[in-house]
Regions:
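Amphipathic alpha-helical polymerization modules
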Residues: 1-140, 209-317
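Cysteine-poor, low-complexity segments in flexible/peripheral regions
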Residues: 139-222
């Protein structure tokens, strides 16, 4: 088969152009550190990279969500821990008042309980660093506990704040105040009539009112009424302690779970990054070797082409 001068020229030029493209592509891989820069480089790998990028983005979002959840639960746990100490002190005062003490001592205990009530009310109305009420549910701009005509009333939201902390796990990260300070657990101590004294602030009010009732020279009916009230306050405070302990236990379990999910998330992050690297990152040894070989081959092609241009064949009309 006879080849025309133009065909030989075109074939050599095309070879050089293809060689340049391959060399430049390898250079791009070295410059970016990526083997797959465009989907056309490796369509299957590119599709897998997109899916893994999405998985990484989701994993990062859940990691951030767990950080916020942990902060919220840790703050609530801290407040409930302090509340437990105060309630325990109040219960101790109530028990102490059951002894043989005079009205002055009883009034002093009542004043102490008033101070503890104010302290607990302040804790129940705690805010986070952004001014959001912790125990108000989703109505974070509302003061959850206010002094009403009949005592402390709850006016916050009635839906606890939940957080999606993993693809298949959502948890309560902040309890509503009424569930914490005005409820009792299933095993609560009952009153003689079968009811349950569960409202923490009401229990304190019962004790305060009873302690402020003079007993020096009082009749038996009054003394019995005061004793019954103090027993009710005692049971109520015990119920509040149990209920808050239950909430704290739930928080503790969930905080441990958050730590476990964080560990899983870190493992997932490492696995995804490893797979992404295998799919798209440049193999430096192979790429550098290919780059040098392609450059040498291209230089040889240039030299050959230039030499051929000097031959008479290319000068023929």
């Amino acid at each position: 088969m006879r080849l025309s001068t133009s065909m030989i020229y075109q074939q050599n030029m095309q070879g050089i152009i293809n060689g340049q493209a391959t060399w430049q592509k390898t250079g791009e891989q070295l410059a970016t550190g990526k083997r797959v820069v465009n989907p056309s480089d490796d369509p299957i790998a590119a599709a897998n990279v997109i899916m893994l990028d999405q998985a990484q983005s989701e994993n990062s979002q859940y990691t951030l969500a767990r950080t916020f959840a942990k902060q919220s639960m840790s703050l609530e746990e801290s407040i409930l821990s302090k509340s437990t100490i105060t309630i325990t002190s109040a219960l101790s005062e109530v028990i102490k008042s059951g002894g043989t003490i005079n009205d002055d001592n009883r009034s002093s205990i009542a004043a102490s309980l008033r101070g503890m009530k104010a302290e607990l009310l302040n804790m129940a109305n705690s805010t986070d660093g952004n001014g959001n009420y912790i125990f108000a549910g989703y109505e974070t701009d509302k003061t959850p506990f206010v002094e009403g005509a009949s005592g402390i009333e709850y006016q916050g939201g009635y839906q606890a704040i939940s957080q999606q902390v993993d693809s298949s796990r959502s948890m309560t990260v902040s309890h509503i105040g009424s569930d914490v300070f005005m409820r009792a657990t299933g095993g609560a101590k009952t009153e003689p009539d079968g009811s349950v004294q569960a409202d923490l602030f009401e229990s304190l009010d019962i004790a305060i009112n009873a302690l402020e009732t003079p007993l020096d020279g009082a009749d038996d009916a009054t003394k019995e009424s005061v004793a019954a009230a103090m027993n009710t306050a005692n049971r109520g405070l015990n119920n509040s302690l149990s209920n808050i302990s239950s909430a704290r236990a739930e928080l503790g379990i969930q905080l441990n779970e958050i730590d476990n999910l964080d560990a899983i998330g870190k493992d997932r992050d490492v696995a995804n990054k490893t797979t992404l690297s295998q799919l798209q990152d440049t193999d430096w040894v192979e790429a550098i070797s290919s780059y040098m070989m392609q450059m040498s081959s291209l230089q040889a092609s240039y030299t050959t082409f230039q030499n051929m241009q000097g031959m008479s064949l290319f000068q023929m009309k």
